A protein has these predicted regions:
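Short hydrophobic alpha-helices and adjacent helix-cap/hinge residues
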Residues: 2-4, 18-22, 27-31, 35-343
Length: 343
């Protein structure tokens, strides 16, 4: 077992601390590099000549913030962060459209779209500007590419598809006698639908009853978790933007009920979930930045750049949550387990 180092775990910052502060730091960093364009691009370029790069995220939560941080850091490493336009739709579809129109009007040379609705909105806004997605579960299900191997248009990116079956297996390791598992998601997000379909199949194969509830906002989420907590032995939460953004609401019910919660993102683990099987969203951002930089430098095109993925093998445990529930890490998971603890 090993502790999750701070450099690998932006999740060491809780939801209550992260979003606004991180957003301010990102904006400050973007402003700093914008005014230092000569230093970034060398004496042959003026700051105004740095290629405009648009970055849009769907909503403020830790997983998406981590991806944006990875994108900005990755672009800086490639000397391409001279003119970033960082935008947040705050979960509003009409705002996504406005942001897409903004990027097109400002003649952005590259667009990064973080989360499935964001990449869909950017794909509707332009068929020519290269778009690189991050924190997108299925680009084919989102109908923005032809195939993962040969995207074929102006969209490519990296997938955040996590090991959904392994998330359920992790839950069963912690609650071996569980008969019914709960999950909550927004049916309006195709990324969530894809993951829930995988979770259903995994539950059926393992003889576990899956209790589902769909939500569209935090009010729905609170009602759903209060009702469902009385019927299930615990929860598995593959990544859903409404649920992740409202994890504090979920935990206000599950923690007093002493229920195990397994998440698909580190932000939810930091908020108080028991354990997680998750991709590294910061590294997703770094991967996306490399794809985008290669496209911007003319090394490849979005059409011919395959969708990137991450291989997730090891679970992460919230030390405090495990102790609160009186749980020990299963022996067969100890060797590769990562431990997270708020500092």
């Amino acid at each position: 077992m090993q502790s999750v180092p701070d450099s690998q775990n932006a999740g060491s910052i809780s939801h209550a601390q992260c979003p606004s502060g991180l957003r301010r730091r990102l904006i400050a960093a973007a402003a700093a590099v914008t005014f230092s364009g000569l230093a970034v691009f060398g004496p042959a370029f003026a700051a105004a000549e740095a290629p405009l790069i648009g970055v849009v995220q769907l909503v403020d939560h830790e997983a998406l913030n981590d991806s944006v941080r990875g994108i900005t850091d990755g672009l800086k490493a490639r000397g391409l962060a001279g003119s970033l336009d960082l935008q947040n739709a705050h979960g509003d579809q009409s705002t996504l459209k406005t942001i897409g129109d903004r990027f097109v009007h400002k003649d952005a040379k590259l667009i990064f779209a973080v989360a499935t609705p964001a990449v869909q909105a950017m794909a509707r806004a332009t068929k020519t500007t290269p778009i690189v997605g991050a924190a997108v579960t299925s680009y084919t299900a989102a109908k923005v590419i032809a195939s993962n191997e040969h995207p074929g248009g102006n969209v490519t990116g990296v997938s955040n598809i996590g090991p959904v079956a392994a998330q359920l297996d992790l839950f069963m390791k912690l609650v071996p006698n569980a008969k019914r598992v709960g999950t909550i998601y927004n049916a309006g997000e195709i990324n969530s639908v894809v993951q829930i379909e995988l979770l259903r199949a995994a539950a059926e194969q393992r003889g576990i009853e899956l209790e589902e509830a769909t939500v569209t906002n935090l009010t729905d989420l609170q009602s759903a978790v209060v009702s469902m907590s009385k019927k299930v032995d615990g929860f598995v939460f593959p990544t859903d933007n409404v649920v992740v953004a409202g994890m504090a609401v979920v935990l206000r019910t599950t923690v007093p009920a002493h229920q195990v919660t397994v998440s698909g993102d580190m932000g939810s683990l930091a908020a108080g979930c028991t354990a997680a099987m998750t991709v590294d969203y910061y590294k997703l951002g770094l991967q996306a930045a490399q794809l985008g930089a290669d496209i911007l430098e003319g090394r490849t095109t979005a059409a011919e750049t395959p969708i990137g993925v991450q291989d997730v093998k090891n679970p992460t445990f919230n030390v405090t949550a495990m102790k609160r529930l009186g749980l020990e890490i299963p022996e067969d998971l100890k060797a590769g387990a990562l431990l997270w603890q708020k500092k």
